[in-house]
Regions:
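Structured beta-strand-rich core segments of catalytic domains in phosphoester-bond hydrolases
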Residues: 8-36, 70-153
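Structural motif corresponding to alpha-helix initiation and N-cap regions
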Residues: 53-57, 130, 231
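Solvent-exposed loop/turn segments at secondary-structure junctions
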Residues: 49-52, 77-80, 102-105, 119, ...
Length: 246
């Protein structure tokens, strides 16, 4: 899994991820928060579940140890949802939005879970030639909002045209009129691309920042995960300016 810690701050922007540093505990004790208001600091995690074969217990362990507030999953199946439910994911992240499952999905549907109650949620926030992109909007202090999405464009093996179109289609999220320093968008998922690919570079130019690049500590190599040393960075947490991480 790929995790990122965000810290709300209206005057600066940036973020960093923490997968190489181990779990980081976040305390809400010094600030007023409710189930309806996102903490000023929060961790997110994204994971490709590989045709729904992911270990539900391992996902739950990561949620607990990394104090995850928002979880994005890709390639999800009904069976995995059942196993996650039996493992009490709803006790940790009681709110969720699923993308609608379709025969054309690439490996499964996408899901987003949250510790906090969304002010809005949709099963598909942008149309791309791939699985639906579910999204939730969370309120933060200071009348700010964060819209978080779980995305999974198709791989080039499923056709280069759809591969590129899926990545480029996510640009619409950064270009939305509602996006501002106080209303940001976070896209998480297996984007099947990296800075080596022109389509991904075009996605960044549309207004997104990449948490991995902001950290400036080298790429987070996540694929293929079954190798001892993964060689490619395909999983990303992208965001529009308006947040800071450490």
């Amino acid at each position: 899994p790929y995790t990122t810690l965000f810290r709300s701050n209206s005057n600066t922007s940036g973020t960093s991820n923490t997968p190489k540093e181990g779990p980081e505990t976040i305390s809400d004790g010094h600030c007023e928060t409710t189930r309806e208001t996102l903490s000023p600091q929060f961790s997110v995690m994204t994971m490709n579940c590989r045709y729904g074969r992911a270990d539900a217990a391992e996902i739950i362990r990561n949620i607990r140890e990394r104090n995850i507030s928002v979880l994005a999953l890709q390639e999800v199946t009904d069976d995995l949802i059942t196993r996650l439910t039996e493992a009490d994911i709803n006790e940790l992240l009681p709110y969720h939005q699923f993308g609608d499952a379709k025969e054309t999905d690439n490996g499964g549907f996408n899901v987003i879970y949250s510790r906090y109650e969304p002010s809005a949620a949709v099963p598909n926030v942008v149309s791309i030639p791939a699985a639906d992109v579910p999204a939730i909007t969370l309120k933060t202090s200071g009348n700010r909002t964060v819209t978080l999405c779980s995305a999974h464009p198709k791989s080039p093996m499923r056709g280069c045209a759809d591969w590129s179109a899926g990545i480029l289609g996510l640009r619409e999220l950064a270009r939305a009129k509602s996006v501002s320093n106080r209303n940001i968008v976070v896209v998480m998922g297996d984007l099947n691309s990296s800075t080596d690919h022109p389509s991904f570079r075009a996605l960044l130019k549309s207004g997104f920042k990449d948490a991995s690049l902001i950290q400036a500590a080298g790429p987070n190599l996540t694929f293929p995960s079954w190798l001892k040393w993964p060689r490619i960075e395909l999983d990303h947490v992208l965001f529009t300016p308006g947040q800071i991480g450490r």
